């Protein structure tokens, strides 16, 4: 077998009959499989050992040779080669067909490649191939031309003969009629009898005339057909064809079936045809030109690839190796077999029957029928069901053909090549492990023993607990006591990977150091639940074991959970305290008025109380029970840094140093909280709402190394749980308080609602107005009940505490629980004007319960649909962007995009742009940012973090030019500088990072949170699509629902207001032609926008509009934006529109991820005029390739090609990729492979997918060449330092943050002999 690491590209082409015979190890002649008595393969059958190799290692069929020493000998009795049995997986056979057949992919695919090549309509092609019509394959024009006059004379003679015969017959009949009439006259018969005789006579004469005319017409038809006879002409009438052959057989040849197609292809001159088509394209117009373009694609493919089109008609069919279509015996003595064997058997049976019929010299009609059946059976083998009814097996199930084995989720590509099952893995239920450090997980003992079995066995032998591996294995299986000690030793420092399905983004797999735990559940650290989206209601997780040293190093350095605190989508920490931890920290940092031990200033009769000289003294007081942690006190601090303003005031320019004392007015709880933060972090004297905690951790992530952040969040977790248990926050029925004012509030709104009802009954309001009025009334009522609820609840109510701290839930839920549910929607998404007045505490009435179920059920159904849709969106995004990898450090481009940092107000103050987090943050600056005085605030090439952005805003800079992947000029992939900071690490992105996949995951992962519904926006006739459908619409570059026209030019508007439509005319400023937009529906309102005078109002007559401005409400069509404003604008438009959907759901994704996808959508150019290049007009070419080819042509003095940028949807863009392996494994497998084979496509293996498929390391991350062969030679210092890094034990998490390291260990004193 080939080793995958030794080839650089993979080519696919058409196999000719010669190729098939060369691959083959012998011909399969019989349809038999195995002998039912001996269960051994039949000779010459589908499992024959002589063709495919022996079924048992080193053993021939008859048993004459039975040892390795006979390797390579071919047995003279049975003809089987003595070799390994696994050759039955790779040796192929073939079937020699008695008549050629066409390959269904090339005849039946859309468009039909055979039809395009031969210029035949697919309908005609089908008639020829399936023996319904004859086709003329060649005509001897010269001979026909030379002998035409002779033949014409012969024809005239024949016609004359027919006419003479006719005239003679008529003459005779007329005479007979005369005689008969005379006879009747003589007999004196009645006029009636005479008329009868005359009529019958005339009728017979008419028949003679008709018969002769038919004969003449037939001769005329034959002659006309013959004179106009041309190759590729169809003759459906069999009698006509027979006549032609009888008369003029030597002047032409014709046939039916695949043989005729084969002959036509043989006579086909590809070069001449290509030249002729190019000529038509240059000079033709309309349909003719389009047809020629399509045909040229196929013809040029054969011309350039050097493929022979003969490969589309097969003389032999390959038989795949028997191990790939196995036959296994079931317990009942029956056999289960692959469907392919049935399909092959039908081919062989029909083929053998055809051979026999031909040998017997059977009539043509019988032979043709058999040939047609052979063609159909080969079709079924290649692609069952593509034409006609599929061949079915037992129970009417369509058999799986070769094509079916490749396509779809269960096909070869997606099932076995892109997703494989792996060894060294296990799965179990997860439970919470609050005692774990962030980088640890609890692994059940039994599972660990099974996973690490080989390691344990090896170590047992090393330590002399066992004599050999076999006894070590027995020890492990019997779980001897010494096994556990060895297991502890083996798993130390050996990380394992945990994965929770669905893995929506890269944080769905993280590495942890295992800790052995009792029981059978995996313990998971509470802070990584957010990233895994895990909870402990029965979720399961899978464990995988990295084996090699490299894999372990990667797991430890790149995947360890404490190195993955930041979200790759937004660059903000994911490992944050949640739920109980938030409640605990909130409780700890709350200040309660008048709590025990509160500070009181000195008075006449008493000294001041509640002042402490150190946190330790305060803690002692709390332990004695005289001080509450939530009481306000004064305390002298020396180890905690004061807040910035106090520091400036007290310590001046030098700043605070550890040990400097200052007095803080705060609570003991807040001091305890601040002691958890890193040394030197300014004191935070606030109540810790979840948002405040988040901003602190954000800040830590910006300023401190990851390791410090990891330790801090761990400490916060411990404190959070500790204080949550002491806060006594529980929920019971007694805590759900119903506001006493609820009844009177509802009564007054009832009265208002009754008034509206009365007006409706009187006819003062129509149905819609009544509904709107009622909805308004009850919305107000709900809000007021909520307000009353708020006031009624005491501050220490646990339910309110949970909501207020931001731990979970929101006030709406509290209102539903204790106040009233309010209005609910019907299945259409409209409010039902009857409110649910009860709260869940009181219980709903039957009617209320019923109307409430609508919304609840719709929500559940929505969620299910959304998950599937979102998963499919992610799959398409990954596919389109999978080969975007950081390829170089800097592409040196001068281009970039301008991002807004702030908006300047009229009074000169700056308002920070709300979207700065996702636009400017974490980018590389493209030009120096200079303030008004000309000082450089941030230099070009600097990374914009939070401090830099603050500096720019302080200097009054409102917008900067940054580098962006949209303007990156790297050929394949992007450069690190244009991409900027990697969101997940907070540093510049590494070369080799698969930023395309990260982008796809960042956009796809929140997909499940987006809504499914289309919003009905006031006044817009069409529904505005929102949520997931809108994101799909944008990425697929579809024309949006409720499409709004955009201004093609800058100019003044003339608005004409008709009955049902608007008509807008724009008079351009530059005096060019007016642009008219007709038939604009009034249901879609005119757009509101800022005018030149700064006012915001609806578009009206005489307004001035800029190019690209939207004229109506709705969404602009991205293709129009591209046409009117060019690629740069459409990129910005798409990014902005996608962000709007995500922001509406409160999801933060950085622009750069969306930009990566948009860049892939605009990678191609469609050729308008090919100039002197090889490109075909109308074809889609990669921009880089297009520019390179143009440069080459111009250098040689030719005409460059002209093209225009085109926007492709993500599905289309993934199918248009250069890699046929990647495209085939995505969708429409057979179509992609058909095309690739005709074009003799070569896959350069640049992307990730194609390398995964063939089993090479992917060219990203550590698989990239520059990282592959790294030799590590430690320096002396490193050797010394290697032993000073403390292990991940408790002292590492000591309060001094491990800044002190031990001294270097003198290694020379240690003996490195075996442990024994």
Swiss-Prot record:
Q: Which GO terms describe its molecular function?
A: DNA binding; DNA-directed RNA polymerase activity; magnesium ion binding; zinc ion binding
Q: Which GO terms describe its cellular component?
A: DNA-directed RNA polymerase complex
What is the native source organism of this protein?
Mycolicibacterium paratuberculosis (strain ATCC BAA-968 / K-10)
What do we know about how this protein assembles, alone or with others? Answer: The RNAP catalytic core consists of 2 alpha, 1 beta, 1 beta' and 1 omega subunit. When a sigma factor is associated with the core the holoenzyme is formed, which can initiate transcription.
Cofactor, free-text remark: Binds 1 Mg(2+) ion per subunit. Binds 2 Zn(2+) ions per subunit.
**GO terms under biological process:** DNA-templated transcription
Pfam families xrefs? RNA_pol_Rpb1_1 (PF04997), RNA_pol_Rpb1_2 (PF00623), RNA_pol_Rpb1_3 (PF04983), RNA_pol_Rpb1_4 (PF05000), RNA_pol_Rpb1_5 (PF04998)
Could you tell me the EC number(s) of this protein?
2.7.7.6
Q: What class of enzyme is it?
A: transferase
From the Swiss-Prot or TrEMBL record, give the protein name: DNA-directed RNA polymerase subunit beta'
Q: Where does Zn(2+) 1 bind?
A: 60, 62, 75, 78
Co-factor(s): Mg(2+); Zn(2+)
Recorded hits in PANTHER family, A to Z, give:
DNA-DIRECTED RNA POLYMERASE, DNA-DIRECTED RNA POLYMERASE SUBUNIT BETA
Which NCBIfam families is this protein grouped with?
A: PRK14906.1 (NF011498), rpoC_TIGR (TIGR02386)
Q: Which residues bind Zn(2+) 2?
A: 891, 968, 975, 978
Keywords (alphabetical) are: DNA-directed RNA polymerase, Magnesium, Metal-binding, Nucleotidyltransferase, Transcription, Transferase, Zinc
